[in-house]
Amino acid sequence: MNEKHILGIDGGASKVFSQLYIFKDNNTVIDQSDTYECRYDEINGHDQSFSPVPLNVQKNEMKDNTYKISNDEKMQSGIVVKAIMKSIEYFTKDKIDHLGFCFPGIKMKEKDGISIMANGPRNPYMLKELNENIAKNIGLNIILKKIYDDSLSCVNGERFSPKGKLKEISDAIYIGGGTGIADGILYNKKLIDLSMYKNLKKSWEIIMPNGDTIEECMSLAGLCKKWKKRKPISIDLLNDLFDKASEKHEMASDIIETAGQAFQLLIDERMNFFKAYNRFPEKIIIGQRMGKIL
C-alpha cells in the first residue's frame, strides 16, 4: 500500500497551525500528528502595534497592480514567513512527501502572494520567499505550488477529515475563523469559490447598517478592538467582554448584540445564494473557534 505523508500548514492573522497527515491511495486519512502552533508574537521583531493598510487603499493598489508595500509591512510579513518556516522545520524529522499551505486574504492572480489582507500585512511574493527559505534553510526537495484559500480549506477539512461534519452532504454553509472570519459554501457537492461570484461577498466586504463590515463586528479581532482598542487581541480580552455583557454593561452588551446581528446577516446572505437556485442547505456548520466566540 502506497502512503502519502502530507504536511498541512494553516496560516492565520495571528498564528500558524501545522499538522502531518498520512493518506492511503484513495485519500483516506490513516494517521495524523498532533497539531503544532506558532504564534507570530513569538517571533523576534513582531510588531504588536502593526495596523493593516486601509482596505480601500489595498483595493485600489490591487486594481492598478501597483503595490506600495511599506518597510513596516515588509517587516511584519517577514515575521509571518519566519513563523511558517518554523512550523515546517518542526516536522523535518518526519517523512514529508508534499506540502499544502492555506492563508487568508485575496491572492495574487497566480496564487503565489497576498494582494489584500484585512487583518495583517500583504506579501505579493510570499510563495517565492517561502520556497527560497525551504531550499536554502531546510533542504527539502519540495516546493509549495500555490497558496490555497483558508475558507475553502476549512470546508474541505469538514468534507474529508475523519471527524468532518460535511461527509455525504450536498449543500451546506460553513462559518468559522479565529482572528478573522473564514466562511464557505458547499453547493451540490461542489465547493464554491466566493471570489468567482460577483453576487457573493466575503465577510469583510459585507457592510452592516452601522457602517462596519461583518468581520469587524463578529470576529475575534473585531470584537476585541471594539471593546478595548489599545489592548492586544486575545481570548482573555474577549472573555472580559462577555463577562461585562453578562453583567449588563451597556457598551459590552451593544457590541455583543451587534455581533449577533452580523452573524444573522451573514447567514441571510448565504441563504440567498441557495434560494436563487431553489435549494436549501442541509447543514450550517460553525467552526470550533467561531463557536467559542458565538
Regions found by a protein language model. Name each.
Residues S151, T179, M290:
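Active-site metal-binding loops of divalent metal-dependent hydrolases
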Residues I30-D94:
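N-terminal phosphate-binding loop and adjacent alpha-helix
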Residues K4-D10, I96-G100, D171-G176, I285:
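Short glycine-aspartate micro-motif
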Residues G12-K15, F101, K107, A118-P121, ...:
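Glycine-rich phosphate-binding loops at beta-strand->alpha-helix junctions
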Residues E73, S77-V81, D94-D171, L294:
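Glycine-rich phosphate-binding loop and adjoining helix at the ATP-binding site
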Residues E3-H5, F17-K59, A135, I143-K146, ...:
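Glycine/GP-enriched mid-protein hinge/lid loop-to-helix segment characteristic of carbohydrate kinases
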Residues N65-K95, C224-I285, M290-I293:
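Adenine-nucleotide phosphate-binding core of ATP-dependent small-molecule kinases
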